[in-house]
A protein has these predicted regions:
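Alpha/beta catalytic barrel-like cores
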Residues: 1-86, 93-94, 100-109, 113-116, ...
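Helix-rich catalytic cores of soluble enzyme domains
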Residues: 90, 94-196
Length: 196
């Protein structure tokens, strides 16, 4: 079943789509069992710290890298109900990038490599979160430029590998504070212009 069909089915059933963080192998196995038993779509939403490319040492969940995690889930997903999703992908969203204090060019290259692995390994929803900045001088225009670059890259790679993806975009760093209404409006208006 294709992603659009899964989502359409949920909309028509008037049910919400549950996203589960793959915090452990037990959580992954339980979620797969529930999706199979009740024939219902569920999303696995993995951060780069939980699951990432083998190029970055994988993630803390069961020592899985992107490819082995995807294979594990897809092999057990008897009714094709599980949707693999990337949560908070982007520069400096992996512990290795933070530890090495990668500069912007290096962090963007790393993020692109991670997204490429996601796309090749059947992740269907990609969260682009370009809000982090190691210098703590994150300007909304800088985040927009990084978002544009990553959005275009993901779109091109999905097209190249004949994969269908949906893209979610983050607008602010997760620090407990929030952007102003005007900042969010500015970000979204500019993102819509870019996408058109």
């Amino acid at each position: 079943m294709k992603l659009k069909e899964k989502l359409d089915r949920l909309i028509n059933q008037k049910k919400t789509l549950l996203g589960v963080g793959p915090m452990s192998k037990n959580v992954v196995d339980s979620t797969i069992e529930i999706a199979n038993k009740f024939n219902t779509p569920l999303m696995f939403i993995a951060s780069r710290r939980q699951i990432d490319s083998s190029d970055f040492g994988g993630g803390y969940v069961n020592n899985w890298d992107t490819a082995s995690y995807s294979k594990y889930v897809k092999k057990r997903d008897k009714k094709n109900n599980l949707i693999l999703c990337r949560d908070h992908g982007g520069p400096w969203q992996n512990n290795l990038e933070l530890k090495k204090k990668l500069n912007l060019v290096q962090a963007m290259k790393s993020a692109k490599q991670s997204y490429l692995e996601d796309i090749k390994n059947n992740f269907e929803i990609i969260h682009i979160d370009a809000s982090l900045n190691l210098r703590n001088n994150n300007k909304i225009n800088d985040a927009l430029e990084r978002t544009y670059e990553l959005y275009e890259y993901c779109y091109e790679q999905a097209h190249k590998f004949k994969k269908k993806i949906l893209i979610e975009v983050g607008t602010e760093e997760q620090t407990g504070s929030t952007n102003t209404f005007e900042e969010i409006e500015f970000f979204l208006e500019n993102l819509v212009k870019f996408c058109n």
